[in-house]
Amino acid sequence: MKKLLSTLLALSLALSLGACAVKVDPSEPDEPAKDELRIVFTEEHLTKEAEYKADDGTVLLIEKYDLPQLEVRTSADEVYTPPVSNTVVDVPQEYAAALAFNAEMQHAADALDASAQEALTMAREHYAGLDEEQRAYWANYAEELIVDSICQHSGLVSVWGGGYSNYGGAHGWESIRAWSFDLTTGEFLTLDGLDAQPSTDSALGESLTHTLAMAVLEQIDAQGLSEYYFEDYASYIFDLAANASFYFDDKGIVIVFDPAVIAPYAASAQKFEIPYSRFYNALDSHTQSLLNVLQDEIIIADYYTTKTLWSWFYQTTPPIDANAPAVMANGQSFNRVSLGEINTLDALRALLCEHVSAELADEWLATGHFVESDGALYAAWADRGSDITIDTESYLVAWNGDAGEIMQTITRREWNDETGDFVPVPGSETYYGYPFTTMNRHAVFSAFPCPS
């Protein structure tokens, strides 16, 4: 009997301890585990292929489109659909984003349908006005949009393809259509919108569109394309948001100008591929988080950002306020710097130390190119241009744990009177090293031997 009482007491104690370990409110239902949802492209697209004919069976117009669609899948790889309820249901962000993307694709399809109907009216009138001999040479009108290229990053998708219209002319009209979509916000990206966001480079006065435009112009110059372009082609390039399409792929951003924008129609669309290393730091931190960019590309992007800072001391002038009066110091004129909150030497040093070591920052500041006066920062006018004998530059990142070194290789060129142009100098390879440590995935350089 005594043994039985001991056993019952032990069981009672165990049950009471278990009850204390988990406090359950019977009035509240158990919260189900949240399923992990993912956004994927569907196998089936939004498509249409239709022929519109005259009464005699002649094809007047062909309309065709093929547009991608998104859907949401569960962890069990089943298509997600929101629960049916008479009350308000919180729709998951992933589902809302997929709906927003599909709505834009439907809008593009509807716009093509409307354009096709207008073109069909023109085609009927055109065909009706032809005699029998002329009808023998009839070529149908066309409206097409085929978006068949896709690149999906962790938080962003880009889709692009070609549009084609023919309204009875000697040739049709080709165009590039592209969309880049933020899967986390359900919004489409624009160059204007990206330009408006603060970034590492925008704090230095370098906008995204200006960075991209300069990269495009460098490619045109390197490939000798300018002689085939319209005289005012550069003005269109500097207004990228209004004149070009863009999309992201696994290597960078692609800027595309439709035919007849910067070059004659016969030259077709002009496409420029710009690696992430050239513009990554001109993107805001949110957009950076959407992209799967290799660490080496980020480090080389840090080189370009730091080169901008270096140039303020050894090559050019930082952004200045042209309307502010200059000041005299050390026998020379200094102009008011226009860098937002960077108004003192201490603030400038803090900015430098985000990118280079304290020792290197102090070395640059010791050049005397910046002075502080009455709570404002001033810089000496120092534009001297770049080294035009540099022919090519390439970069390789070598790692040693969380630190490393950028290895820069440059080749030289020289002027040739016979050809009237620069020619490469054989055996002119020169190597420069840029040692760095990393902080939050970005480089902090301890040496910057830029050959300018």
Give short role names for the model-derived ranges.
Residues 160, 256, 407-409, 446:
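Beta-strand residues in well-ordered beta-sheet regions across diverse protein folds
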Residues 183-190, 405-407, 417-452:
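Short beta-strand edge/turn micro-motifs at domain boundaries
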Residues 71, 94-104, 292-380:
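Core segments of small alpha/beta cavity-forming domains
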Residues 16-19:
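C-terminal motif of bacterial Sec signal peptides marking the signal peptidase cleavage site
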Residues 1-9:
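Positively charged n-region of N-terminal signal peptides that target proteins for export
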Residues 21-295:
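Compositionally biased intrinsically disordered regions enriched in Thr/Gly
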Residues 149-154, 371-417:
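Surface-exposed, charged secondary-structure patches
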Residues 144-150, 177-180, 392-397, 422, ...:
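Hydrophobic/aromatic beta-strand elements that line small-molecule binding cavities or substrate pockets
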